[in-house]
C-alpha cells in the first residue's frame, strides 16, 4: 500500500453549497458522475446531494492517498494545488454492480505516474469504499501498485 486517504462530508452543508447561486460545486463532477448520482437518487428515493457528497468524499480521499504516497516516497513536490486540482477529471463512478471505482482522465493518470516515478512495469491501482448514514457521507481510498 502506497497511500491511504479518508474523508467525511456533512451532506446537509454540501447540499446547501450545491444549491447556492453561482456555486462551483457542480463543476467538481463530470457529467457521468452527475448522471449516476441522479439515477441512484431516483432508484433509492433519496437526494442527489447525498450521492454527490459521497463521491466528493471519495475524491478527497483519493487526493489524500496520493499525497500520502508522495510523502512516503520522500517527494515534497505536489502535482496540483487546492486551486488547480482537476476534480472533474478524477471520477468516482459505479461499475455494473454498483461498486465505486476511481477513473482518472489520461492526463491525470500520467501525472500520477510521473509524480510517483512509476516504472513502465508497474501500474497504480485504486481501491475505494463509500458509505453514508443519516447526514454523513464517508469514503476511504487506498493507492496500491501492481508490479
Curated annotation (Swiss-Prot):
Catalytic activity: apo-[ACP] + CoA = holo-[ACP] + adenosine 3',5'-bisphosphate + H(+)
Binding residue positions for Mg(2+): 7, 60
MF GO annotations: holo-[acyl-carrier-protein] synthase activity; magnesium ion binding
Alphabetical GO biological process terms: fatty acid biosynthetic process
Source species, domain of life: Bacteria
Subcellular location(s) of the protein: Cytoplasm
EC number(s) on file: 2.7.8.7
InterPro entries named among the record's database cross-references: 4-PPantetheinyl_Trfase_dom, 4-PPantetheinyl_Trfase_dom_sf, ACPS, Ppantetheine-prot_Trfase_dom
Pfam families: ACPS
Gene3D superfamilies linked to this entry: 4'-phosphopantetheinyl transferase domain
Keywords, in A-Z order: Cytoplasm, Fatty acid biosynthesis, Fatty acid metabolism, Lipid biosynthesis, Lipid metabolism, Magnesium, Metal-binding, Transferase
One annotated Gene Ontology cellular component of this protein: cytoplasm
Cofactor(s), by name: Mg(2+)
NCBIfam families, per database record: pantethn_trn
Protein family membership: Belongs to the P-Pant transferase superfamily. AcpS family.
Function: Transfers the 4'-phosphopantetheine moiety from coenzyme A to a Ser of acyl-carrier-protein.
Protein name per Swiss-Prot or TrEMBL: Holo-[acyl-carrier-protein] synthase
Amino acid at each position: 500500500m502506497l497511500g491511504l486517504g479518508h474523508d467525511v462530508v456533512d451532506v446537509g452543508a454540501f447540499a446547501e453549497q450545491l444549491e447556492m447561486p453561482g456555486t462551483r460545486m457542480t463543476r467538481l463532477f463530470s457529467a457521468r458522475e452527475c448522471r449516476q448520482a441522479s439515477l441512484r437518487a431516483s432508484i433509492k428515493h433519496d437526494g442527489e446531494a447525498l450521492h454527490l457528497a459521497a463521491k466528493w468524499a471519495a475524491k478527497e480521499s483519493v487526493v489524500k492517498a496520493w499525497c500520502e504516497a508522495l510523502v512516503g516516497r520522500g517527494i515534497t513536490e505536489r502535482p496540483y494545488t487546492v486551486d488547480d486540482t482537476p476534480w472533474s477529471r478524477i471520477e468516482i463512478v459505479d461499475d455494473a454492480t454498483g461498486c465505486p471505482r476511481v477513473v482518472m482522465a489520461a492526463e491525470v493518470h500520467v501525472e500520477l505516474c510521473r509524480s510517483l516515478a512509476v516504472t513502465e512495469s508497474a501500474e497504480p491501482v485504486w481501491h475505494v469504499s463509500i458509505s453514508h448514514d443519516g447526514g454523513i457521507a464517508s469514503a476511504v481510498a487506498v493507492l496500491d501498485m501492481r508490479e
